[in-house]
Swiss-Prot record:
<keyword id="KW-0812">Transmembrane</keyword>
<dbReference type="InterPro" id="IPR021684">
    <property type="entry name" value="WBP1-like"/>
</dbReference>
<protein>
    <recommendedName>
        <fullName>WW domain binding protein 1-like</fullName>
    </recommendedName>
</protein>
<feature type="region of interest" description="Disordered">
    <location>
        <begin position="302"/>
        <end position="321"/>
    </location>
</feature>
<dbReference type="GO" id="GO:0016020">
    <property type="term" value="C:membrane"/>
</dbReference>
<dbReference type="Pfam" id="PF11669">
    <property type="entry name" value="WBP-1"/>
</dbReference>
<feature type="modified residue" description="Phosphoserine">
    <location>
        <position position="173"/>
    </location>
</feature>
<dbReference type="GO" id="GO:0031625">
    <property type="term" value="F:ubiquitin protein ligase binding"/>
</dbReference>
<dbReference type="InterPro" id="IPR051994">
    <property type="entry name" value="WW_domain-binding"/>
</dbReference>
<dbReference type="GO" id="GO:0038160">
    <property type="term" value="P:CXCL12-activated CXCR4 signaling pathway"/>
</dbReference>
<feature type="compositionally biased region" description="Low complexity">
    <location>
        <begin position="145"/>
        <end position="173"/>
    </location>
</feature>
<keyword id="KW-1133">Transmembrane helix</keyword>
<feature type="region of interest" description="Disordered">
    <location>
        <begin position="132"/>
        <end position="250"/>
    </location>
</feature>
<feature type="compositionally biased region" description="Basic and acidic residues">
    <location>
        <begin position="212"/>
        <end position="228"/>
    </location>
</feature>
<dbReference type="GO" id="GO:0030097">
    <property type="term" value="P:hemopoiesis"/>
</dbReference>
<feature type="transmembrane region" description="Helical">
    <location>
        <begin position="42"/>
        <end position="62"/>
    </location>
</feature>
<keyword id="KW-0597">Phosphoprotein</keyword>
Length: 344
């Protein structure tokens, strides 16, 4: 080529316009009649370098894309291999689990029965009452049979402030049409007790002796009402069946006994046999039902009118006491309830 020859020789013959030749003493032929001393002055020099740079960039991009694609394929292959190994080894137990003895594992029933069974009741008498309640007609609202427990046991388990709110009258069942009369009588008794309590609180403090006697009588009547109501007997049969009396034990339990005061021996024996057959065990009778039970036994205030106080000396005459059950939410902070409530 002519420009290579110019590098070797000091003079270079160049071909110009119209095939006319000229000689460049220094440099190389440039253009049609010029001599250039540097290669960067040539136009094709920059064209070659531009093509080289573009091709190099294309090669670099292709190489990086191929490298990234290969790395992604390798990662996916490793993930598939790990998943395949886990799925293959999942069915078989590990080696250190195959020789694990069976007595170290919990029983199947213990694992399945979650949550565990509830704790036993506070006394055996309450358990017997729960066993006797399901054959009777349940409440109209379709509540579970465990909610239809006797009011006596509910009042014993509750605290002195929350007991009266729980021992309110339950809705009458469909199978017991005669129990409709019991809530009406109790509502009238509550209204009478509220009026008498307000009048007594305005006059002054109560007489301690009369208050203790009326409180014990009120508690016995409440126990009789609860036993007759849950037993399905009409209110007229209260005098024919003996009442119940409760006393606290040292282990915070409650013992329920039958009060045999004011009843004949024949009726008492018949009632004893019926209770023994129903509860599969003998039930103790109270030695003295006239003794006043502890103060925490029943929550509430028993107030009666002056006519009922005059009849206190005649135990055979029917005396329906007026009982006021304190509301623990509305009357808890009032000063009247603090003066008239029984000490706990």
């Amino acid at each position: 080529m002519p420009f290579l020859w110019g590098l070797r020789q000091d003079k270079e013959a160049c071909v110009g316009t119209n095939n006319q030749s000229y000689i460049c003493d220094t440099g190389h032929c440039c253009g049609q009649a010029q001599c250039c001393s540097h290669y960067y002055e040539l136009w094709w020099f920059w064209l070659v370098w531009t093509i080289i740079i573009i091709l190099s960039c294309c090669c670099v991009c292709h190489h990086r894309r191929a490298k990234h694609r290969l790395q992604a394929q390798q990662r996916q292959h490793e993930i598939n291999l790990i998943a395949y190994r886990e799925a293959h080894n999942y069915s078989a137990l590990p080696f250190y689990f195959r020789f694990l003895p069976n007595y170290l594992l919990p029983p199947y029933e213990e694992v399945v029965n979650r949550p565990p069974t509830p704790p036993p009741p506070y006394s055996a008498f309450q358990l017997q009452q729960q066993q006797l309640l399901p054959p009777q007609g349940g409440p109209a609202g379709g509540s579970p049979p465990g909610a239809d427990q006797p009011q006596g046991s509910q009042g014993a388990q509750s605290s002195p402030l929350s007991g009266p709110s729980r021992s309110s009258t339950r809705p009458p069942s469909v199978a017991d049409p005669q129990s409709l009369e019991v809530p009406t009588e109790r509502a009238a008794t509550k209204a009478l007790g509220m009026e008498s309590s307000s009048s007594v609180a305005s006059h002054g403090e109560l007489d301690p002796g009369a208050f203790l006697d009326r409180d014990s009588e009120c508690k016995e009547e409440l126990l009789k009402d609860s036993s007759s109501e849950h037993g399905g007997a009409p209110p007229d049969s209260k005098d024919k069946t003996p009442g119940r009396h409760r006393r606290f034990t040292g282990d915070s339990g409650i013992e329920v006994c039958v009060c045999n005061r004011g009843h004949h021996d024949d009726d008492l024996k018949e009632f004893n046999t019926l209770i023994d057959d129903a509860l599969d065990g003998p039930l103790d009778f109270c030695d003295s039902c006239h003794v006043r039970p502890p103060v925490d036994e029943e929550e509430g205030l028993c107030l009666s009118s002056e006519g009922q106080a005059r009849e206190h000396g005649h135990p055979h005459l029917p005396r329906p006491p007026a009982c006021l059950l304190l509301n623990t939410i509305n009357e808890q902070d009032s000063p009247n309830s603090q003066r008239s409530s029984s000490p706990s």
